[in-house]
Amino acid sequence: MTVDRQALGFGYGEHAAYASNPWASRGRLYPEASSPTRSDFQRDRDRIVHTTAFRRLKHKTQVFIAADGDHYRTRLTHTIEVAQIARALARALKLDEDLAEGVALVHDFGHTPFGHTGEDALHEVLEPYGGFDHNAQSLRIVTKLERRYAEFDGLNLTWESLEGLVKHNGPLMTADGQGLRGPVPQPILDYCALHDLELASFASLEAQVAAIADDIAYNTHDIDDGLRAGYLTFEMLEEIPFLARLMREVHDRYPGLESSRFTHEIMRRQITAMVEDVIAVAQKRLGEVRPESAKDVRCAGRVMATFSDEMSETDRQIKNLLMTRIYRHPEVMRVRQGAASIVTDLYRAFMDDPSLMKEHYWIDQIAGMAEPARARHVGDYLAGMTDTFAISVHRRLFDHTPDLR
């Protein structure tokens, strides 16, 4: 019996001409039969959600390492918020929502324990062997390190999902093969030798909305978490004209509103304003370029989903506020220093004695490896750790573990 795809709610008739077509995917590295009940992009999204890497995001830091209280964001809650915004943008622009959501859900898979602090520490110890890049690590996870399926390593995602993962922040190299932001990480080059992700072009519009959704989400929720932690005040927010205007709107409409509700009303207005700004810019640029296919978007030579000049300035001001008031706060810096030492200590311990990893797969795999491969293997193990697991292992192996609270 033939399944009516539109009757299943895939809604391809609602897609714009420039949207990625789930029925015309460029395929998977290992060919698979299509599902009669789900599009290829739906299957990608579902595979991503069922991974151990996705579950581990629950115990990985967003900003506040080992924070007291259950209301601060983690990588998982951040990822879910990004996916919601990406899906809303995709619907407004008549894109494939499943592809946009999938890219949003997978974009942080490669993050280490302790956020960017852990990544910096791991990059430093791995620098002699090519360093560490969380985006390249995300690709390694979904193409190699997740071991779930009988016929292949990784998730065997479609070309479009992998392209979106690797290029959601823009092209990685020039047409003549030069890296645009430094050397292209070797894991990305290695995969492209098997399955060319066309690193010199832009990604699909679905991937672009996932990228800008990431900016919108963390700009908003880092303010929320900063207020909750006491690192930010409403007076500090008033220094930014955009936020000052939102605060006046809320105050005028709801005078005397309690602090938590006041904060929420500001945040929801901030998200709405930023989303509407991106939609307006994307519609304008699409009207100028008039792409007739997803390929036309990739070859347009510029990003389609981005902020206006005015909102870009607001974005810059918010990032500067977050950097000076939160990310470089003395207490945050103290905790970051301790977190970095945990990652460095564990790396050295595992390199000296791999049996300390205590997991047979990782120990067995490292036997006989040359030092560069051994270092990358230990890096993979460390990158997969959650904050809580890294702390507990450090306590088992060392007499003193830094207090991260």
Curated annotation (Swiss-Prot):
Pfam families: HD, HD_assoc. The keyword Cell membrane does not apply. One of its GO terms (molecular function) is triphosphoric monoester hydrolase activity. The keyword Ribonucleoprotein does not apply. InterPro entries: dGTPase (IPR006261), Diverse_Catalytic_Enzymes (IPR051094), dNTPase_2 (IPR023023), HD/PDEase_dom (IPR003607), HD_domain (IPR006674), PHydrolase_assoc_dom (IPR026875). Residues 75-219 form the HD domain. Keywords: Hydrolase. It comes from the Bacteria. NCBIfam families: dGTP_triPase, PRK01286.1-1, PRK01286.1-3. PANTHER family: BIS(5'-NUCLEOSYL)-TETRAPHOSPHATASE, SYMMETRICAL, SLR1885 PROTEIN. Belongs to the dGTPase family. Type 2 subfamily. This is Deoxyguanosinetriphosphate triphosphohydrolase-like protein. It comes from Rhizobium meliloti (strain 1021) (Ensifer meliloti).
